[in-house]
């Protein structure tokens, strides 16, 4: 099946993006840190981006990539991309849902250790956009497939938060990237409480093995770690020492899981061998956008 399409409007022309090209770079990011803003046209199965306004653009969203983005590094090493496989592939589109309860907490899930992409990582529910899908259709499908959640009609609202350029492996020091995604984060604000939502969660054990809810204070501490301004163990005394989560048992039931704060504040390591359970860099960016939406 064909994938949903990502197109860039460059110098007035629509162009596709090859696998090894940095989306942020093509939009004029250069080597300076982001986020930047891009104008977007959102259609069924297609996303068009441009650094300048264009007819049909309906949104202007922040877009970001990690400082260690391998595709930004490849832009500086063009000879590498010519010798590696997968260069004839494009960039896949994904949608991730930041589900906010009426208590102002958001849902994160832990990917199973058997998944090919980003195993053991804490992320919001989400996945690939199919070629015939709208953005919200994709987000709600993934929320159902991963967490068994369907939201009652007229009891939620949605806000497009921003875009994240994602690679896996996430660093060139881990190896040449095998996956290249542009992820659109959608904030879904439910009128139901965390307790009401949690009572209906039934995670898919093939994709998810734990879930948790983060409040603004913990989210702010997590966000502060990615740019190196803090290190694990150095955080406000007002924060809890741990966060309560729910873990899937082998028999299909659930059990409480205590996550120490330093686990949530880990950053992306230099090598794959050092990688441990953590919150993904893209998720930290999404949490930052969520906090901005709350006025934090």
Curated annotation (Swiss-Prot):
Domain Nudix hydrolase: 90-236
Annotated binding of Mg(2+), by residue: 142, 146
Domain of life per record: Eukaryota
Pfam families cross-referenced by the UniProt entry: NUDIX
Motif extent (Nudix box): 127-148
Catalytic activity: a 5'-end (N(7)-methyl 5'-triphosphoguanosine)-ribonucleoside in mRNA + H2O = N(7)-methyl-GDP + a 5'-end phospho-ribonucleoside in mRNA + 2 H(+)
Enzyme class: hydrolase
Its EC number(s): 3.6.1.62
Similarity comment: Belongs to the Nudix hydrolase family.
Purpose: Acts as a decapping enzyme capable of hydrolyzing monomethylated capped RNAs (in vitro). Hydrolyzes monomethylated capped RNA after alpha and beta phosphates to form N(7)-methyl-GDP. Shows low activity towards unmethylated capped RNA.
Protein name as it appears in the record: m7GpppN-mRNA hydrolase NUDT17
Lineage: Eukaryota, Metazoa, Chordata, Craniata, Vertebrata
């Amino acid at each position: 099946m064909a994938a949903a399409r990502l197109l860039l409007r460059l110098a007035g022309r629509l162009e596709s993006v090859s696998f090894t090209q940095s989306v942020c770079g093509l939009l004029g990011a250069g080597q300076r840190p982001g986020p930047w803003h891009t104008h977007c046209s959102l259609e069924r199965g297609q996303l068009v981006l441009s650094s300048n306004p264009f007819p049909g653009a309906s949104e202007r969203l922040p877009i970001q990539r990690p400082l260690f983005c391998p595709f930004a590094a490849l832009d500086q090493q063009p000879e590498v991309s010519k010798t590696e496989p997968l260069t004839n592939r494009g960039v896949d589109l994904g949608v991730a849902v930041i589900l906010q309860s009426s208590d102002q907490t958001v849902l994160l899930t832990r990917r199973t250790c058997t998944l090919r992409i980003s195993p053991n990582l804490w992320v919001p529910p989400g996945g690939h956009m199919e070629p015939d899908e709208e953005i919200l259709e994709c987000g709600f499908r993934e929320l159902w497939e991963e967490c068994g959640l369907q939201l009652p009609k007229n009891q939620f609202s949605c806000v497009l938060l921003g875009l994240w350029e994602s690679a896996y492996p996430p660093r060139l020091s881990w190896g040449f990237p095998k996956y290249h995604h542009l992820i659109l984060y959608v904030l879904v604000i439910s009128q139901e409480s965390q307790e009401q939502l949690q009572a209906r969660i039934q995670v898919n054990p093939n994709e998810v093995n734990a879930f948790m809810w983060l409040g603004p204070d913990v989210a702010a501490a997590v966000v502060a770690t990615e740019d190196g301004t803090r290190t694990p163990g150095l955080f406000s005394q007002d924060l809890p020492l741990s966060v309560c989560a729910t873990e899937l048992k082998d028999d299909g039931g659930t059990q409480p899981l205590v996550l120490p704060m330093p686990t949530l504040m880990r950053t992306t390591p230099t090598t794959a061998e050092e990688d441990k359970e953590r919150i993904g860099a893209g998720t930290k960016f999404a949490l930052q956008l969520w906090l901005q939406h709350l006025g934090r």
